[in-house]
Amino acid sequence: MNRREALISLVQLSALGAIGSASAGVLASDRPLAIGTHADALPQPPKPGALAYLSADEALEVAAIFDRLIPEDELGMSASQAGCVVFLDRQLAGPYGQAASTYRLGPYMQGTPEQGPQFRLTPAQRYREGLARLGQYCQQQHARPFSGLTGEQQDALLRAMEAGTAPLDADFFALLLQNVREGYLADPMYGGNRDMVGWRLIGFPGARYDYRPYLHRKGLPLDLEPVSLLDRAG
């Protein structure tokens, strides 16, 4: 499976999860709906400059990991080139990183697979501890950080993490993979998906609100230029 197929399969699985509860209504009017989204009602895009949560060394290691998971190739830019490290840094500094919407007060006990991941640490804490453990392991095995390893060494270590055969947390690998995908496919206003590279890769049109002009093109490619939420503000 290549990168395009992997990203498309992720989007398809996400869509299937929402289909069961979704329903559509028919609008009788021929007039496009007014856009009521104003810039001050939207999250503000990350400003270039200093990191918000990650240290410079941590950001360097995250970039090295992300670029092995989504490397630059003929289909598009790498994860770090697409802004995925910026996306992650801002997310870890915000409510997601602090697990603001997650109950973590106990009682603590072994959960079931149906309950999903159970973690006492916040995502921000998991990154801080996970990157530290990864750095220690790389120094012990190779006398250099992950970012200093060869591509083959990096891939071998990531495969071992994913399989749970390395003395590193397989759940941390799953978190890394989840977040790099999110950064590559999220709206560019969150810092990743630069130039909407992820959306162009999978043919996603973005934040378009009215498809009536294209209803007659049944079974034909639309080839629409992606639209970001930033383009809809105002």
Placement of each model-derived feature along the sequence:
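C-terminal segment of N-terminal export signals and the immediately downstream linker at the start
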Residues: 1, 5, 18-64
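Short helix-onset patch at the extreme N-terminus, typifying the N->h transition
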Residues: 4-9, 150
